[in-house]
Amino acid sequence: MEIDLFCELASPPGRPQGADGLFQDLIDVARAADRLGFGTLWLPEHHFLGDYSAASAPDILLGALAQATERLKLGFGVLPLPIHDPIRIAERLATLDALSGGRIMWGVGRGVTTTELEGFGAEPSSSREIFLENFADLQLLLESGSFERAGAVYSLNPRPSARLKDGWVAAVSPETFDLAAE
């Protein structure tokens, strides 16, 4: 049996702690999980939510965890696609995959809070459409390692490995369940 961890990076009530303390605790937890044989440590991505979550840059945190661990898989759980450029996501996944020796897992989702969407200038009513477009683009980027724009072909470096072709989709609506099943 494999047991995974999901770390929200919240500041617990009655235990005010700055980001530096939360991040050091995360590294300590990851090292212990690695030593004890846990499967994957997943990090979310949230913005502008106060003490709820300090996980605004999970790619940077996962890079630190990749260097602090040896076997523990490390996962994005989940990347909110309506607020991200799929090219940058593919580049970061490929970089982290190389940095971690192939231990990066990824999941994507449509939903973040209205506060987060609006904070990034995304219209909440358009989040599904943007998610679908960005998800299709991300899949193509991870499979091909390149894209075309205005007649020019651009290649990602590092090139995404075959390990990255499969990911997870967070779903709470019937339409997204169908997408995840595909």
Cite the ranges covered by each PLM segment.
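Hydrophobic alpha-helix-in-membranes signature
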Residues: L43, A57, L79-L81, D85, ...
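Short coil/turn segments at secondary-structure junctions
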Residues: P13-Q17, P80, E118, A122
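Active-site beta-loop-alpha junctions enriched in small/polar residues
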Residues: E8-A10, H46, L79-L81, G109-T113, ...
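Glycine-rich "substrate-gating" loop/helix at the edge of Rossmann-like oxidoreductase active sites
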Residues: L49-S53, L79-D85, E123-P124
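Gly/Ser/Thr-rich helix-start
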Residues: D51, A64, F76, V108-V112, ...
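Hydrophobic residues in well-ordered beta-strands that form the structural core
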Residues: L43, L74-F76, V108, V169
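Internal, glycine-rich beta/alpha segment that forms the wall or movable "lid"
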Residues: D85-E182
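N-terminal beta1-alpha1-beta2 module of alpha/beta enzyme domains
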Residues: M1-A68, K73, K165
